[in-house]
Amino acid sequence: MHSTNNNSNKRNNEEKHKQPEIDSSANNGEGTSGTRAQTVGDTATEAGVRNETEAGASTRRQTDGTGLSGTNAKIATASSARQADVEKPADVTFTIENVDDVGIMQQKKPPTVVQSRTDVFNEQFANEALHPTTKVIFNGLDVNTEVQPLSDDFKQISDPKGYLTYSVKYEDQFTKKDKLRASEADDRIVGPTVNLFKYGAAVVNIDLNRDFFDTATGIDLTKGIPLVQDLLVPIGVTAGAEQSAEYVSGLLMVLFKVMTDNRLVIVGETTTPMSNTLSTVVNNVLRTTYHNNVGVNPALLRDFTQVNWLNRDITNMLQQAGTKYGLGLTETRLDYVRLVKTIVGHALNIDHFAASVLNINLRALMEANVTADDRIKALQAHSMISTQFHGPNQGALRPELAFDHDHIIRCLMLAAANYPRLEGIIVQINTGYVASANVIRPVSEKRYFPENLEQNQSAARLVSAVKARASEADISSIHLAIAREVSPMFNVHELKKIAESFEDPSSIVVVLEFILFALFFPTEFNRIKGDIQNVLLLFFSRWYPVEYGIFVQRGATYTINAAGEFEFSGRNEKWDQALYLSEHFPALFSDVPLAGANTIIAIMRLFTPQGFLRTDDLAIAANFPRASRNPQTYIPYTNQRGTVTNEFASRFRTIVATLANVVNERAVQDDMQKATRSCTKQWLRHLETQFDNIAVAHTDHLSVVYATMSNFMLNFTNNFSGNHATFKPDQYVITSPEGSYKPIIERQGETVDGLTIIDTSIVWPILCQCTYPLVRQSGKGVDAVSIMEEIVYPDPSTTLSQSLSVAQVLSKLTLPDAFINMILSGGDSVVMRTYQTEADDDLDEGIRMTTYDQYLSHIRERLHITNVPDPIYITGASTPDQIAASVQATHVAVVLYQSGVINGPASTYLRENEVLVVMPDYYDVVSRFANANLQMNNNRYHESVLEIADIFDQADFIQTSDAVRQLRALMPTLSTSQIRHAIERIAQITDVDSTDYGKLTLRFLGTLTRSLKMQNAQIRRIRPDGTVLRYDDQIDIEAFRWSRYFLDELQLRRLSVGLRLITNPRIARRFNGVRIMYLTDDDPDPDFVPDVPEGYVAVQYAHRLFSSSLANKRNRVTYTHPPTGMAYPSPTGRPHVHMTINERAGMSKLVADNIIASVIKSNWVVDILDIEYTAEVMTPSEGYTQHVDAESIMTAPKGKLFHLQFMDGLLRPEPSAFDPPASGEDMRLIYPLQPISVARSMRAIVNHNEVDRPRGAVAPSSYEMDTGTLSRNGDLLYSPVANGQVGIPKLEVDHISFSNVVSMMTANIRTGDDMAVERVNPDDVRAINIRNA
């Protein structure tokens, strides 16, 4: 391990055990973000146009290299610097030097991110500001590089808000002003609870917490239910259905908020209670320490409420088995290596839904098992090949989420489909790295021509032709061209237009330009080779018209058939770049011999690439996302150290010789002057010398840069195979079940000059106006002497940090798509029957079956999307081994019945492995199985729903699929545009603007191009003709087999909790059916359902029961009584009827009025079953704030969701002698068909006769007060009712608990810290072997 004496000795002399100052950020409150601000860093240290002489360049030190050749610079980085404000760039100064009368502008560059953090780290170390454990770990280590967390998407808080809270409605007449006396110490604990649940509370409800579901989400909770406008906007529904859409939208927003709840709880301010100052009751519930913000729980009313009956009830519940309430510290976990606390558990007054998510977050973080080696591998993948790292493993003290390769690659693919400009962001990161590597830079001296070039008319034309193509050296364009070579492509590229007639021999310059471009940039050349063919064909038609005619007769394009044979078109057609992704290839690059076109073939062979495919080995080791099972990158050339001759230079000599012959032949044919041939050859020989000089820089330095960048995290697609004749990029799309898809590579993408519009003339300044460190070292630069310019090894943390920031932004940008995709896809199911085959079978035991109709309409559609092989057909001869092989190969537990009687062993296998058998129908299924199954009966089956995810052996979401199905049943049918609107609405509340580089990413990405219906979306390859291909586990990566809704494991686990929250009856509060009955209501009870009196005749509503007839000289609505057939034109005097209305569709207002009149005048009882409504309980002092009459209910359109208010008159004030007498009775028409006070926790917190319990008063549930336990696997459990038993998981029942154990991090856990390591750069860049072992 390398070390630096200065730092090491200094650190060894530090006092190791002195307590440092505690970072105030460790005790931040709710809303304090643990997401770190990041700076862009010095990503383009050489960006901009700089024309330097070699002498001027030699005076410049590279400030961004951090590691120089064979040395280790002493640079320490501060973890806490990442928490600071975004760094401000230092002032830029300029100096002018006169070298050979050329003005040179040099920039004094601002310090890099690493350099800025160096000072902070050293200062903290010297001033005792580092955690003592951290100091011990880093003693003796020469820290010169930082490694940031690979996945840090948590927000640290110390005072967590719950999802649920108590809301109280008071009746002022009963409120007592005197407060129960409690000691000051007790009051700190019980005060908030006593003050909330005070005497005179009419009702206490459990509601969603406004403080958590803030206004930024757009959730309106004024009616006790979540309502959101403008999320789901159904089109074409009848008026009045908006409320239903708002309600479902509210549930979706609540669910999304829970799914994205990334809070981590850190230990906040705590108190150690002094028992002698507290009452016995309080002492009994407090642990050794407790959080200062105690919160509210009914258990704290014990002995402190003035309501006697309530005190008795709570006391009895807390004393019974199965209810254990506590407050404060429950457990402590230690790092046994360093003997420091890491995790503590605290019993808090918070609902179990929020507590579950908080525990899920911390558990995911602590169980990820990410080591220092994992971070170092990520850093190594962004470092120059052969760089070594040394760093300590800090274990549990620096936890982070595991880098989810599968999830990130799915998000990258979805983001690429949505944002084609993502290509530009990745190119920008790569460009910054090339710039910081200082591998190439321009000089003022231009070497386009030999010094002794002949001075004649032919030479003048040549110079003019070269100058027409060779532009001034633009270093940023050169860096971009290099970076583009290994970057993913999400837009089809095009050649920048070239105007050339090829009438003059000097026009060979354009042909040479193309060859040089193919040599320097073979990947980019392949992307635009079709456009280049158009130019070359014009050249051949002018210079070799006979050969050209032969060539186009064979065809200008070809395809490759299934046998791998080339099939030429036989047409002379101009290439269109839209064909690049098609099955067509430009024929010039077929490398197929053609008799009579030898010159064309000879010239085209000069375009053959000379590089090699390199496996992205470091990216694989770092578990970086890659879209291929065999991730490789084509490197244009390889290092040549140890070879006698440089193959790259030799290749150019071959090119020069070939082109010299071409020009010579052309000159002879056209009887050109000797001077023309002479000056051209002289120029080509000059270029050959130039190429000889720079070849070593490309093969021994730039090749290492390419190999390094090939491992970068965001270079996740294979770039090129090295064969222009056969290569087509893998084309992936995001599919949907309706047959549409969104391609990853846009055929008609944005045209951006330099990014997608390619200028091949960039090769001229690379060849003739640039210098390289290795060229200067060789003495072949303009200095004419050897200058030992140091090789720069760029800081890898800059590009890694930027890549992680982009990945984080893209993951968040795709989250709304993923969320809606899950809602529309999750819970997909098919109806099946389970036929019992044994006498003692339970309902779900037996052989599973469904029909072809079900299979075709549900499963088959999904099979197409997931593109697995077809299941096998089974017959009477099928064996268990054959069935097992099919299930293993297809990953689908489905077989298709074809014929015969299924034998006994096969039947047993189908039963034991829960394979789904697809039958033609259910007719006499017993006859299709062996007689050995004597217990099987055609009528002995259980019909149920089978999750499609279960069929596919991908049971990621089984536990919540029922809840998803319930939610989907409430949603209106949505078009693609409506789904897109919902996604964009959710995106407005998605926090993606987290880092400095993230902000740049957002600005650059531009407008979203989202045209796909996100439902059952999957990632699939397509053929060049657009045919969607089945998933192929020999080609496609495992991450593409199943999209997992584009959500990661942590999001799915939170989502599971959120679904249980919104489907909990006490929160959902959606009801069906009301009873219309005319009764007095002097003492209103919201849950009262009046009984149907005896003797009433049950009648099902039908339109035919009501007609129009003439009675008393008027047309009247006449009711015909089914039992007797008697007609009753008047609502008065009709028989006692209990009418049930299952479907109101088509009911006229006249009939509705007539039925209501019958309720009032003939005491009918009418049950309306198809009405849906949310309910709100009102108190006497509130009164009704809105009114819905019975007629509106009966005539409302289908889909309308009512909001009904019901009065709770239990605490209606007694009238005084001075109140005027009532003039009549209170009458009521509308009653619920089931209790609607599901949200209620307590009712009537008053004493009757100062002591007794009022009739109908309700105490809180014991479940609300039961702290229970936190199991080893992270589940919150209720207390067991008996010793030796295990408590019920709180999430599996509909009860709500407001006392739960929450795991918290101590200050010893530093999730937001970078990890400092020692980086050892290679001794010699030319000794690096870039070929894989």
From Swiss-Prot:
This is Inner capsid protein VP1. Keywords: Capsid protein, Inner capsid protein, T=2 icosahedral capsid protein, Virion. It holds the Pfam family VP1-like_C. Residues 22-42 have a biased composition (Polar residues). It is found in: Virion. GO terms for cellular component: T=2 icosahedral viral capsid; viral inner capsid. Coiled coil: none annotated.
